[in-house]
Amino acid sequence: MLKLFSAFKKNKIWDFNGGIHPPEMKSQSNGTPLRQVPLAQRFVMPLKQHIGAEGELCVSVGDHVLRGQPLTRGRGKMLPIHAPTSGTVVAIAPHSTAHPSALAELSVIIDADGEDRWIERDGWLDYRNHSREELIARIHQFGVAGLGGAGFPTGVKLQGGGDKIETLIINAAECEPYITADDRLMQDCAAQVVEGIRILAHILQPREVLIGIEDNKPQAISMLRAVLADSHDISLRVIPTKYPSGGAKQLTYILTGKQVPHGGRSSDIGVLMQNVGTAYAVKRAVIDGEPITERVVTLTGEAVSRPGNVWARLGTPVKHLLTDAGFCPSADQMVIMGGPLMGFTLPWLDVPVVKITNCLLAPSASELGEPQEEQGCIRCSSCADACPADLLPQQLYWFSKGQQHDKATAHNIADCIECGACAWVCPSNIPLVQYFRQEKAEIAAIRQEERRAAEAKARFEARQARLEREKAARLERHKKAAVQPAEKDKDAIAAALARVKEKQTQATQPIIIKAGERPDNSAIIAAREARKAQARAKQAQILQADESPSTADPRKAAVEAAIARAKARKQEQQAVTDTSANETVDPRKAAVEAAIARAKARKQQQQASANTSANETVDPRKAAVEAAIARAKARKQEQQAAANTSDNETVDPRKAAVEAAIARAKARKQQQQAAANTSDNETVEPRNTTAANGEEVVDPRKAAIAAAIARAQAKKAAQQKVVNED
């Protein structure tokens, strides 16, 4: 009795809520064996054919590749892709891929050479002798991903399961209408599928292995039972046909009675699920040493004349496959990648086949019927009754339409498997799945932005904390440096303290002077003398910096004196010109102007003499010569004036007075220059010296007296001229 109860419990299955029973339409394609399709001329291999990031390119344009050669490197969760045939890489550029929006992905474009040569294949026939890690790494590097539609990397999934997997489920339900790829694969390759299942079981070491298959596949069921006849480690469970029993959560509940928690994974309850096609790809990767370069694709629909299942190379354009199946497009023909409920319409037919492509549906207009106009929701709750995830599609519809993301998240929109059952039963023809897909995409974008903001905030806070730590450490170092002086400063500080202590000691000691003795002030006197000497030296430096160079050139001094004389002469001439311009000029004004001219000339003469006196060593002979020359010039001017007066019977007395004043000014200027030159000489030559021209040089005092006499004579001559003229 106990054994009977255990057997009953072992074969027990559960039923999930909701679900629908649409027309299956599988008989169009499941009746013919798998066939090969002729190679296309060009293959387009998108770098990303799975969930996760794309791999790193390892080929370049112009490279010749063989079938199975890696085109990218897979690291971490990145899955590599492999060349579907031998040929030449002609381009690496973005190309439209299998996506509802026909997004462009970076792709490797290969022109086939028609030889279809493989790389060297190294199969592991004795895979049981390899470790679990080695098998997982081989599966990952050979590009195996979930072929049931999700495209999750199989190696990553196996690695994440770890040792907590108790039940391995092989999904052979294939519940969506029209699709028969897994059905035909089990019929034609049942033994290889089972071998792949055993490899997965060897890696995971589960307590039980279950194959779930719907009862609408009798040929596949019979083939599997024949292969599993002598096997007791794998159980085949036949379940009722119901859509979507092939969903991961739904099939898990049907076979085990366990429900995957909201937001969780099946591995959380000890269950891991793989697809039939994935098991077949694992077998070819491990035992045959062949990377995944092709998969089974269903070509069906009334628009194709030869429906069936084919081995389609990855990267083959959809148009090439449909043409091989006898595609006869109508005016408004559509092609759906996937099934009628979960698939999407292709915008054009040059989209390549990828790892998740399981069906290409080309229906006629009669198959799909006339498009129905979307109407308002009547809240009939039919969608809620049909939902296999126990959600409220009508509420999610309102939240999605109203952009109420928080409420949609609170109502578990993430648990929606997008099976399309709600849209199938909706009497208002509302495309609920499209609303839900868009809402989930918007929520994902918001979450990604929040993650980026959180990461940026974390980086900023970490930077601020680091700066605070560095600042605190810097202040601490400064404090330690201030409290603890350096070793080289300790000696200086000690010496200073010793000097201060010595001074304090000396200040406290009394000064004792014995009777009859004088205090010893020699140190004080020496310090005073040193300060005086320092002050004198400083004053001498200041004076030396202020005065002109000690050794000036005498020629420059003479030039400056000549310039001063020229300026005085010019001013006198201007005065004479101004005086002659006026017919009636006051003699007093003329005398005043002459006096002003004499003052200016005297000032310029003094400046010139000052510049000349800067010379330390001036030859006194030259000074005497210059004085004699000045006297001669004055005498000559007086004679010229007398001659001019005698020639002119009528001479203006004013002009004569001006000329006399000019002569006196010149004589005085020359006298001052001679006196300045003579006074600057420290050592004067003997008074009676002979100049270069042979004239006798006179003492400067005598020269001054002679100049005065000359002035008196000139004045007397001028007065006499005035009297004679009157």
Curated annotation (Swiss-Prot):
Residues 537-559, 568-587, 593-699 are annotated as: Disordered. It is found in: Cell inner membrane. SUPFAM superfamilies: alpha-helical ferredoxin, Nqo1 FMN-binding domain-like. Binds 2 [4Fe-4S] clusters per subunit. GO terms for molecular function: 4 iron, 4 sulfur cluster binding; electron transfer activity; metal ion binding. Residues 658-676 have a biased composition (Low complexity). [4Fe-4S] cluster 2 binds at residues 387, 416, 419, 422. Pfam families: Complex1_51K, Fer4_7, RnfC_N, SLBB. Keywords: 4Fe-4S, Cell inner membrane, Cell membrane, Electron transport, Iron, Iron-sulfur, Membrane, Metal-binding, Repeat, Translocase, Transport. GO terms for biological process: electron transport chain. Its EC number is 7.-.-.-. [4Fe-4S] cluster 1 binds at residues 377, 380, 383, 426. Gene3D superfamilies: 3.30.70.20, NADH-ubiquinone oxidoreductase 51kDa subunit. GO terms for cellular component: plasma membrane. Residues 369-397, 407-436 form the 4Fe-4S ferredoxin-type domain. Its cofactor is [4Fe-4S] cluster. The complex is composed of six subunits: RsxA, RsxB, RsxC, RsxD, RsxE and RsxG. HAMAP family: RsxC_RnfC (MF_00461). Part of a membrane-bound complex that couples electron transfer with translocation of ions across the membrane. Required to maintain the reduced state of SoxR. Belongs to the 4Fe4S bacterial-type ferredoxin family. RnfC subfamily. This is Ion-translocating oxidoreductase complex subunit C. It comes from Escherichia fergusonii (strain ATCC 35469 / DSM 13698 / CCUG 18766 / IAM 14443 / JCM 21226 / LMG 7866 / NBRC 102419 / NCTC 12128 / CDC 0568-73).
